UniProtKB/Swiss-Prot annotation:
This is UDP-N-acetylglucosamine--N-acetylmuramyl-(pentapeptide) pyrophosphoryl-undecaprenol N-acetylglucosamine transferase. It comes from Rickettsia bellii (strain OSU 85-389). It is found in: Cell inner membrane. It is a peripheral membrane protein. UDP-N-acetyl-alpha-D-glucosamine binds at T11, G12, G13, N117, R160, S188, Q290. It catalyses: di-trans,octa-cis-undecaprenyl diphospho-N-acetyl-alpha-D-muramoyl-L-alanyl-D-glutamyl-meso-2,6-diaminopimeloyl-D-alanyl-D-alanine + UDP-N-acetyl-alpha-D-glucosamine = di-trans,octa-cis-undecaprenyl diphospho-[N-acetyl-alpha-D-glucosaminyl-(1->4)]-N-acetyl-alpha-D-muramoyl-L-alanyl-D-glutamyl-meso-2,6-diaminopimeloyl-D-alanyl-D-alanine + UDP + H(+). One of its GO terms (cellular component) is plasma membrane. The gene is murG.
Length: 356
């Protein structure tokens, strides 16, 4: 049985797409090993059938301290890959993959990289020069070296299995008496900005349109929840608050509009099920990739991008009301999203099989 090694870590945005790819490769009778870091150890599910290994490497803060840590991590990765003798190594970007990718190059194992964002990150840009194939999620991905374009294939993003099980078409009902459901989330602990901005936006909206029927589901840190509860209770609207939502699929299927950051995994999941969103990109994201992701979708009429530096509760309230008042806009946006949908887990698996 041939072995494939997947390397992803740092955040769930890298980790979960790699797991979805691994599940598809296991179905195709490959032995799949998964190298991750300590931050993603909490996501490991041995029931998925993947064989996990942890080699930790964080983003460098001090280059003098980083080099010895990188050398140690590369040594561990070489030792592991030599023992496995894989047919290919697939990296998903970010600093946690660096050691394993260097090890694969040293051992002359074919490497493939997958870029989830619309802007090729620093790590993927470097390893693109050594990769047999570069899989991208967007045909207009920026920051691609010219010399690798003939090795680049659009496979689309990769979506978790439980999200792929949802109905692909989000149906819109032109019913003014219907409760409009908004789902708000912003990272593993909820974005502080969202806890302050969005309740004030809903308050401004309800003051101008008191007859609106809303249901708000919002991710928020525990410290922020009392204040948010008071605002929503005083507005007499239905709401649900949580620090973290385990079952995103269940939330998506009961939602009309999402307000979120613009990470690659979020965008791919919403694209797959045709669920429109207002994106507020995280300004501190590496290479400003969240802005590039959201702006590309906005340009293709697949969502709305509102920059954090420019947004206000009044502007957000106006945008929400515009969308509630015009269900046709949401319907068209949903259709545009579905046109972008790809079965990334299958297309990337095909690419790997062609390579080995």
């Amino acid at each position: 049985m041939k072995k494939i090694v997947l390397v992803a870590g740092g955040t769930g945005g890298h980790f979960f797409p790699a797991v979805a790819l691994g599940e598809e490769l296991i179905k195709r009778k490959y032995e799949v090993h998964f190298i991750t870091d300590l931050r993603c150890e909490k996501y490991i599910n041995h029931d998925a059938g993947l064989i996990f290994h942890v080699i930790d490497l964080k983003r460098p803060k001090n280059i003098l301290l980083f080099l010895p840590l990188l050398s140690l991590a590369i040594f561990k990765a070489i030792k592991l890959l030599f023992s496995l003798s894989p047919s290919a190594v697939v990296g998903f970007g970010g600093y946690p993959v660096v050691a394993s990718m260097f090890a694969a190059i040293f051992l002359r194992v074919p490497i493939v990289i997958h870029e989830q964002n619309s802007y090729l990150g620093k790590v993927n840009r470097f390893f693109a020069n050594f990769a047999k194939k570069i899989a991208i999620s967007y045909k207009n991905t920026k920051n691609l070296p010219v010399v690798v374009k003939n090795r680049t294939v659009v496979t689309g993003g990769i979506v978790r299995k439980n999200i792929r099980g949802l109905d692909s078409v989000v149906k819109r009902r032109n019913d003014k008496d219907r409760t409009f459901k908004i789902f708000i989330f912003g990272g593993s602990q909820g974005a502080k900005l969202f806890s302050e901005l969005i309740p004030e936006s809903i308050k401004a909206l309800m003051q101008k349109q008191p007859n609106l029927k809303l249901h708000i589901t919002q991710q928020a840190a525990l410290d922020d929840q009392v204040k948010i509860k008071n605002i929503y209770s005083n507005l007499n609207i239905n709401y649900e608050l949580a620090e973290f939502f385990d079952n995103m699929a269940n939330q998506y299927k009961n939602t009309d509009l999402v307000i979120s950051r613009a990470g690659a995994s979020t965008i791919e999941e919403l694209t797959y099920i045709g669920l429109p969103a207002i994106f507020i990109p995280l300004p501190s994201a590496a290479d400003n990739h969240q802005y590039h992701n959201a702006k590309l979708l906005e340009d293709e009429k697949c969502g709305w991008c509102m920059k954090q530096d420019d947004i206000s509760s009044e502007k957000l309230a106006e945008k929400i009301f515009e969308l509630i008042s015009n269900p046709k806009i949401l319907e068209n946006t949903s259709k545009n999203l579905l046109k972008r949908r790809k079965e990334g887990h299958k297309l990337l698996s095909n690419l790997i099989e062609e390579l080995i």
